[in-house]
Amino acid sequence: SVGFKAGVKDYKLTYYTPDYQTLDTDILAAFRVTPQPGVPPEEAGAAVAAESSTGTWTTVWTDGLTSLDRYKGRCYHIEPVAGEDNQYIVYVAYPLDLFEEGSVTNMFTSIVGNVFGFKALRALRLEDLRIPPAYSKTFQGPPHGIQVERDKLNKYGRPLLGCTIKPKLGLSAKNYGRAVYECLRGGLDFTKDDENVNSQPFMRWRDRFLFCAEAIFKAQAETGEIKGHYLNATAGTCEEMIKRAVFARELGVPIVMHDYLTGGFTANTSLAHYCRDNGLLLHIHRAMHAVIDRQKNHGIHFRVLAKALRLSGGDHIHSGTVVGKLEGERDITLGFVDLLRDDVIEKDRSRGIYFSQFWVSLPGVLPVASGGIHVWHMPALTEIFGDDSVLQFGGGTLGHPWGNPPGAAANRVALEACVQARNEGQDLAREGNEI
């Protein structure tokens, strides 16, 4: 007699375990599953658990050489989504042993690597992940975090101000540096390379770094404040990226920048380690995020990408504005802003937070509001994001009819006014424009 029956078998026999008690060390995932017509939700949920952990479509004899019960992902709870036809939230628990320590790359390859192309599913979205302390402790996390950054910059009790230098492509290095200087001199804390400024024929990276450093030091000398410019170190290879970060450190500037999704988590984590070892702050841009997170029923929600970045490492990350030109709902955005900044975040479904998350004092990340905002949004932004944030106005600074320094000054004045009014107990939402 044979040891097992060959043939295709239902996933739910092995991978749907509604009685399972989740462990403190499990990585928990919440998926929004839209099964194909005729596929029961239990089978779809079990299929997700199987395909993203130990499963294959049939029993193989090598299954006998390991303990499936120890290593398999388990679908432990399913709930229908209110107001949606044939859509379910499926909860899956993964044993910690399935993941390499300190590798966001491996975590994602395991959890979302294969399962999204699965035939039994019409659509699949990863809504949230619970990262247990046992796993988050294997990551360095942000190079410095919010508190250390404030100490380095000597700026307290208010949001920081930034500005992306526009036109994003086409300026020469010297003119670029001039724009940087004018904005910093006018009162901003930071200026920023656009995410697609790397090292193009009209402006090579080394020239840009040099002129921006000059602009920073000149503005610092004249204002008596610490200034920075996010020098984009993103490059075609990890080696080239590190080379750029090394040059930035040699110039003595305070901060570099990386596009973490296009650059990849492996490169990002390498850069974050370099930044902590060498005292550089790291600004993270989320170019490509909407490709992954914009569809409501398929992809990965940005709060998961934000959690992954906090593990991989970054001191700032773009997180939507609630008020500008790009999409983002207020409560949901505030949910993942808290996930970035706070130590303990309680489960709260109204804000899209499916699991309580405990970060064990992994440093926090400053959320960056950027994209189509200008000075009249300031009261709203100050109220929504609070002190620990970076507010970035690109066109909102350089678009000032009198030029960059007045544009920068206007933003700074507005910010100081809003913060002062708030501290004096006025209601920003109501009285913002008079302030």
Curated annotation (Swiss-Prot):
PROSITE patterns: RUBISCO_LARGE. Keywords: Calvin cycle, Carbon dioxide fixation, Chloroplast, Disulfide bond, Lyase, Magnesium, Metal-binding, Methylation, Monooxygenase, Oxidoreductase, Photorespiration, Photosynthesis, Plastid. One of its GO terms (molecular function) is magnesium ion binding. The disulfide bond which can form in the large chain dimeric partners within the hexadecamer appears to be associated with oxidative stress and protein turnover. GO terms for biological process: photorespiration; reductive pentose-phosphate cycle. Its cofactor is Mg(2+). The keyword Chloroplast applies. This is Ribulose bisphosphate carboxylase large chain.
